[in-house]
């Protein structure tokens, strides 16, 4: 720790921390229009100049040293800031009354602060037309070229979305240069030369709302908000992102609809621009509320009677609910012996419980701040930028600010990952090799491993010159080519070899391919070979790294081999320096998993669907009985940081709530938030109204509370390590993935006016070309046997039976229930591929085609339930299907 003094105030900080950050944390105001917390300094505005130990420095870029004495103001500094403020006002439209940023404009605030009431400089203006960028609108006449939009996109989102382009303004004369302070001249010179432009002129900017949020003026704004409301008329309602498990802090900005309409309306969503980042669905997908809800007493009574009389025996729901609602469901389960059905939360619950047995802790030990502070990160089992974009932002931040390196394991390439950094490597691999990833991590980083595991891992090395050459020359399968099956990367078993040490040094820099006593020999990991890893490259990017983390996604949770993966992940947390984060797949999956006792099978009887299909449904969209959306409820979520965070109701609601049903059944609290102090043993007895929800000036998190990660007695028992085999992709078939496009998360985001769209089959340009289809074409997607996601190539087995050639069992008969999900007209039993035998019935849907140049494969989304793509993904997020073109974008058939 270092001690510095700013304007006479003693401040403690880390050696090397930026002075501006220290000042903000200590409550000392230093003006700055270009700097973003957690971003790279650009020195664009130069307003943050200070005097440090007698020298002029820019506090956004100058690092604190122990004993430093800093002054934020002096006559010279004030004169510079006054001149810079005047420069920003040159030819700046004096139309604050109608500007969307008026009332929260940082330039406006600066002009008031500096008491700028004169203008000493002038130059001929240039034509600057307003530009429509889709979801964003850019007005160059208001732009001060602070570069925040560029910084936010690059350092937070990991994309090069915006760039500087020539403005075409007049050059400044020598007389103008001599007439003003040098920093003001530098700012003016840049302002005359540059404007902002999109890198891709066809980009609709749906994923770059963050860049508009950080704009200090009204230059870059949301198109839908333009000229809609004055900022000072809006009331901010603090809440949490309802769409994904980051549950990030956001504010619903509301006011009444008009003079004759007292009902309030959400006009936009905003955020704490310095410390919270919102993805597209959180920022744009907020208007999915049930604003026309009514109380259908007949349906309400039917639900109550059905549960009381034992006719309703199941409640099927998803994890887009609050902790309080989950508690209500659990109390109803206990009282009426109901089966609670939530497949994704159950899978996550089972994974966590198995993980805890072997990790020796109640929960995983990493959070998003851990990721940001890491300098080596492994990501596996997730399409990160789609499944958990805010974690993707954290990884990108670590790469940009900490020079972090790492590995992104995924069968398909996400082009956006390449923007994180040159040493953050995408490693394609065959599906089914998830266990090999964790075994390689244990082999590479494990310390003080149990003897049984140490012996197994040591047996999975080869020592030979030939093996080393083969490993370095090996090329992974090209996931983009639909003719290449996933099995090209190798089968699930790895040949055993004896010998080698398997522990890694604490900094992870030990070379697993190091030379043995014979310099011609190298030690090669069989797991690394199966995954296609270049171990020499890995050792290079591991050099001098000290802070390690591992992100595990839904691919590891939704697989028949999830129990083995959970145990191995627990061992990684316990025996390696990697901090582990297991991503909850939906908004409140972690909360539901901790609060509810979930069932794998439905009980005999009727099913109440809560925002799901059922014999009778209670939900926000197209249900028998109206339910409130998460925008209309107060309660809490448990996010992936293991924090219980509050959310508040932004809009009124006129229908029944789940708490009303519970009260009618004798499980009663006046309000749902009455359950907040009694959510369960893992939670704190804190009332809802006592929960905070903000970040302070230093970025410290004051949102709710963090769950206690209690130590548990860890299992020392040896277990059988099952290895899955890659999914078999047959002739004429293609591997598809279950995932959403980057701006979609669920049926609620898909129902919003800004993001509303129908689901489609998303293809990379390469696959689309190979299949002979284009955007807008209609295709049939089908499986002849309806169970291709269960088909495996030979090679599945155990690590102790590396030479077993028996292979995996063939596909099981398709479950009869799945046939009910077929699209109308799917599967003619008299067709060539049809038969009366159940195993040969078709699974089939029809979808239009969209092209996603950022993804190297094919995927079907789940945000649009009408698409019914889930019929292909019963046990895994991967499936092997055939795709046949039906008609082109003009509706013309083949």
Identify the role of each PLM range.
Residues 207-267, 374-376, 380-406, 611-623, ...:
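Phosphate/diphosphate-binding loops
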Residues 422-478, 515-606, 685-686, 691-704, ...:
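Active-site phosphate/pyrophosphate-binding segments
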Residues 316-367, 567-599:
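Anionic-ligand anchoring segments at beta-strand to alpha-helix junctions in alpha/beta enzyme folds, i.e.
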Residues 289-296, 342-473, 480, 515-530, ...:
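Glycine-rich, acidic loop regions that bind phosphate or pyrophosphate groups
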Residues 94-120, 129, 149, 159-169, ...:
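N-terminal leader/propeptide and maturation segments of large enzyme subunits in energy/redox metabolism
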Residues 1, 30, 35-37, 330, ...:
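A cross-kingdom feature strongest in bacterial/archaeal respiratory oxidoreductases
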Residues 242-243, 258-307, 313-321, 865-866, ...:
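Catalytic P-loop NTP-binding/switch module of NTPases
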Residues 46-204, 208, 212-213, 217-241, ...:
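Fe-S ferredoxin-like electron-transfer domains
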């Amino acid at each position: 720790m270092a001690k510095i003094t700013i304007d006479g105030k003693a401040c403690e900080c880390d050696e090397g921390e930026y002075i501006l950050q220290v000042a903000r944390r200590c409550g000392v105001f230093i003006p700055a229009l270009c700097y973003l917390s957690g971003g790279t300094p650009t020195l664009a505005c130069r307003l943050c100049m200070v005097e440090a130990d007698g020298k002029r420095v820019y506090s956004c870029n100058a690092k604190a040293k122990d004993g430093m004495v800093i002054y934020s103001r002096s006559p010279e500094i004030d004169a510079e800031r006054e001149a810079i403020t005047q420069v920003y006002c040159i030819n700046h439209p004096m139309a604050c009354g109608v500007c969307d940023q008026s009332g929260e404009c940082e330039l406006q605030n600066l002009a008031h602060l500096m008491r700028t009431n004169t203008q000493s400089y002038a130059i001929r203006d240039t034509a600057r037309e307003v530009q429509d960028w889709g979801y964003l609108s850019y007005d160059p006449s208001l732009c001060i070229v602070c570069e925040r939009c560029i910084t936010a996109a690059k350092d937070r989102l990991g994309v090069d979305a915006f760039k500087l382009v020539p403005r075409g303004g007049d050059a400044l004369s020598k007389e103008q240069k001599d007439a003003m302070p040098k920093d003001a001249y530098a700012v003016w010179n840049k302002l005359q030369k540059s404007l902002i432009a999109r890198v891709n002129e066809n980009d609709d900017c749906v994923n770059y709302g963050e860049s508009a949020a950080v704009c200090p003026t009204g230059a870059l704004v949301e198109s839908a908000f333009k000229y809609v409301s004055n900022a000072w008329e809006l009331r901010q309602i603090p809440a949490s992102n309802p769409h994904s498990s980051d549950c990030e802090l956001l504010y619903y900005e509301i006011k009444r609809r008009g003079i004759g309409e007292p009902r309030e309306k959400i006009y936009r969503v905003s955020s704490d621009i310095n410390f919270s980042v919102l993805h597209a669905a959180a920022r744009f997908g907020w208007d999915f509320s049930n604003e026309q809800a009514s109380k259908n007493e007949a349906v309400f009574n039917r639900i109550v009677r059905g549960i009381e009389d034992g006719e309703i025996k199941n409640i099927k729901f998803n994890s887009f609910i609050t902790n309080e609602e989950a508690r209500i469901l659990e109390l109803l389960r206990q009282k009426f012996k109901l089966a609670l059905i939530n497949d994704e939360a159950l899978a996550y619950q089972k994974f966590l419980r198995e993980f805890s047995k072997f990790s020796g802790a109640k929960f995983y030990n990493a959070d998003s701040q851990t990721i940001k502070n890491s300098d080596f990160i492994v990501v596996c089992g997730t399409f990160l930028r789609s499944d958990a974009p805010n974690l993707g932002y954290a990884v990108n931040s670590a790469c940009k600010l900490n020079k972090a390196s790492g590995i992104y394991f995924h069968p398909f390439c996400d082009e956006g990952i390449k923007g994180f950094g040159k040493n953050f490597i995408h490693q394609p691999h065959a599906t089914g090799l998830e266990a090999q990833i964790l075994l390689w991590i244990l082999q590479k980083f494990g310390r003080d491993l149990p003897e049984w595991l140490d012996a197994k891992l040591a047996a999975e090395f080869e020592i030979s010159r030939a093996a080393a050459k083969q490993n370095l020359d090996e090329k992974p399968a090209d996931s983009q080519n639909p003719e290449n099956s996933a099995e090209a990367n190798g089968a699930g078993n790895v040949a055993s070899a004896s010998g080698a040490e398997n522990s890694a040094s604490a900094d992870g820099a030990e070379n697993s391919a190091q030379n043995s006593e014979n310099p011609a020999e190298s030690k090669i990991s069989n797991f690394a070979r199966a995954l296609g890893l270049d171990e020499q490259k890995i050792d290079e990017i591991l050099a001098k790294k000290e802070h390690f983390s591992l992100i595990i996604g839904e691919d590891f949770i939704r697989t028949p081999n999830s129990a083995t993966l959970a145990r191995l992940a627990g061992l990684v947390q316990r025996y390696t320096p990697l901090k582990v984060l297991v991503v909850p797949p939906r908004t409140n999956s972690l909360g539901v998993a901790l609060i509810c006792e979930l069932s794998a099978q439905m009980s005999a009887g009727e099913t109440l669907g809560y925002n799901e299909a059922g014999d009778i449904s209670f939900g926000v969209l197209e249900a028998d009985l109206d339910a409130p959306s998460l925008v209309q409820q107060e309660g809490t979520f448990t996010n992936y940081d293991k924090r219980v965070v509050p959310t508040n109701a932004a809009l009124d609601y006129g229908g029944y709530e789940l708490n009303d049903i519970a009260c009618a059944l004798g499980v009663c609290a006046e309000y749902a938030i009455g359950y907040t102090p009694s959510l369960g043993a893992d939670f704190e007895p804190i009332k809802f109204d006592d929960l905070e929800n903000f970040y302070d000036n230093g970025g410290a998190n004051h949102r709710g509370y963090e769950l206690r990660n209690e130590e548990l007695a860890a299992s020392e028992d040896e277990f059988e390590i099952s290895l899955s085999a890659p999914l078999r992709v047959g002739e004429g078939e293609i591997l598809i993935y279950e995932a959403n496009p980057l701006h979609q998360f669920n049926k609620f985001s898909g129902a919003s006016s800004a993001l509303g769209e129908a689901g489609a089959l998303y293809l990379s340009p390469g696959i689309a070309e190979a299949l002979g289809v284009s955007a807008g074409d209609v295709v049939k997607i089908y499986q002849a046997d309806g169970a291709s996601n269960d088909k495996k190539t030979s090679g599945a087995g155990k690590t102790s039976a590396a030479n077993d050639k028996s292979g995996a069992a063939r596909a099981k008969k398709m479950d009869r229930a799945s046939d009910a999900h077929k699209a109308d007209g799917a599967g003619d039993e008299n067709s060539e591929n049809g038969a009366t035998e159940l195993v040969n019935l078709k699974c089939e849907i029809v979808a239009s085609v969209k092209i996603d140049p950022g993804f190297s494969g094919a995927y079907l989304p789940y945000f649009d339930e009408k698409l019914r793509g889930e019929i292909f993904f019963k046990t895994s997020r991967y499936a092997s299907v055939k795709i046949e073109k039906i008609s082109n974008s003009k509706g013309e058939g083949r």
